[in-house]
Curated annotation (Swiss-Prot):
Its EC number is 2.1.1.72. It holds the Pfam family N6_Mtase. This is Type I restriction enzyme HindI methylase subunit. The keyword Electron transport does not apply. PANTHER family: TYPE I RESTRICTION ENZYME HINDI METHYLASE SUBUNIT (PTHR42998:SF1), TYPE I RESTRICTION ENZYME HINDVIIP M PROTEIN-RELATED (PTHR42998). GO terms for biological process: DNA restriction-modification system; methylation. It comes from Haemophilus influenzae (strain ATCC 51907 / DSM 11121 / KW20 / Rd).
Length: 443
């Protein structure tokens, strides 16, 4: 890192008077220029960050505000952090990573629906990574947003005493600002990556067209209606059928299958409609993918997990070389999780472990059992008999109701009596309302 771009240099020089001599030559002309020059030096020293760092001077931020931010960050203990007076055993790189992730999540909450292009809730990212277990190989996200799946992959590997150098990170992103967010996310954590030469559309300008990937994870925009280009009409990626021009769900799925290595695995977040839609060739594409025995597991998610959409979602897990041929595991997780506030649901660590452990037990046949209303192992024949619909609720059934010992006839008698009481109360209230309206002259 060049001397002029180190934090200590910014801290010491930012308090100088305009015109003062700089330690590395030249004169001090303001904090914004100082920071921009530091960005220039960083990009010159790191080719991958060229054009990524936004210049401060373009935002006309007050000089005193910039000085205050530098002082605030300088007073923060990144090297010896504490929480509630107790030391936190994390390195400076990890702390900075958490800070960056925190701001992304807060921006996502503030942005609401617009945040979907760059942010996937951490609990969903954690669930997918725990289920896929990307210990080594090529990891790819064709709709990477700010790179959350890559960050969680690093955490997963570290937690299991692995080596991050055993994975290669590949990603692509259409939005230029989001592409830069992802690059900065990797740089802060020291993760090497290949995001292509520039931001680009994964369908019309694939940056990794010849690469085969071992783990592919993605959360693309649900039901994207504006993805089609006539150049895609005879694309070799549509091996299971041409996706409808008005919905990109099965375009994403087939794009990912195309890039799958012989032992590769996929986790793809899609709208629930992808599991049952029969319109515009989607049913035929799903049928072909099922018959190819690529689908390994389907997970139905609870609502209110996302800041940007209320569309019910699911996760498709595909495996090019799954152990249990001719079978699919269905998991209905719609009742799992807790409300973290009035509008958003989240998973606990135990929730994530329950879902992930169910898949792993099923894969190894080690202690797995079907559980009514939660999980079910179904054969391809059963799926065929259900018209190739992959909705977990159709297979897992409902939980058995505990017998309370009250005879059915007695229950019906009590319910009927309660209903009569409610009808009578309703009639009484209706009469009272009419009386009040009449008193106001509204017969």
């Amino acid at each position: 890192m060049p001397a002029s771009a180190r934090w200590q240099a910014l801290q010491e020089v930012s308090i100088l008077n305009t015109g003062a001599e700089l330690p590395w030559g030249g004169k001090f002309s303001g904090v914004a220029k100082l920071i921009d020059d530091a960005f220039d030096a960083i990009e010159k020293d790191n080719e991958k960050l060229k054009g990524v760092l936004q210049r401060i001077s373009g935002y006309a931020v007050n000089e005193d505000t910039l000085r205050g931010l530098i002082i605030l960050f300088s007073d923060t203990h990144f090297t010896r952090p504490t929480y509630n007076g107790e030391p936190v055993h994390l390195g400076a790189k990890d702390i900075l990573g958490h800070v960056y992730e925190y701001f992304l999540s807060r921006f996502a909450q503030a942005e609401g629906k617009r945040s979907g292009q760059y942010f996937t809730p951490k609990s969903i990212v954690s669930l997918i990574v725990e289920m896929l277990e990307p210990y080594s190989g090529r990891v790819y996200d064709p709709a990477m947003g700010s790179g959350g799946f890559f960050v969680q992959t690093e955490r997963f590997i570290t937690a299991h005493q692995g080596n991050i150098n055993n994975v290669s990170i590949y990603g692509q992103e259409f939005n230029p600002t989001t592409w830069k967010l992802a690059a900065m996310n990797m740089a802060i954590r020291g993760i090497d990556y290949d995001f292509g030469k520039y931001n680009a559309d994964s369908f019309t300008q694939p940056q990794h067209i010849d690469k085969k990937m071992d783990f592919i994870m993605a959360n693309p925009h649900f039901n994207d209606k504006e993805w089609w280009n006539e150049s895609l009409a005879d694309d070799p990626r549509w091996a299971y059928g041409t996706p409808p021009k008005g919905n990109a769900n099965f375009a994403w799925l087939q794009h990912m299958i195309y890039h799958l290595s012989p032992n590769g695995k996929i986790a793809l977040l899609l709208a629930n409609g992808s599991m049952s839609s029969q319109t515009n060739n989607e049913g035929e594409i799903r049928k072909a993918i099922i018959n190819a025995d690529l689908v390994e597991c389907m997970v139905a998610l609870p609502g209110q997990l996302f800041t940007n959409t209320k569309i019910p979602a699911c996760i498709w897990f595909l495996n090019r070389n799954k152990k249990r041929k001719g079978e699919v595991l269905f998991i209905d997780a719609r009742q799992i999780g807790y409300m973290k506030d009035r509008v958003l649901r989240d998973f606990t660590a135990d929730d994530i472990a329950k879902i992930a452990d169910t898949l792993h037990a099923w894969q190894t046949s080690d202690g797995y059992e079907d559980q009514a209303a939660f999980c079910k192992s179904a054969t391809l024949e059963e799926i065929k008999n259900n018209d190739f619909v992959l909705t977990p609720g159709r297979y897992v059934g409902t939980a058995e109701q505990e017998d309370d010992g009250v005879p059915f006839a007695e229950k019906m008698q009590n319910l009927t009596a309660l209903l009569k009481e409610q009808f009578a109360k309703s009639a009484e209230l209706e009469a009272e309302i009419k009386k009040n309206l009449g008193g106001l002259g509204y017969e």
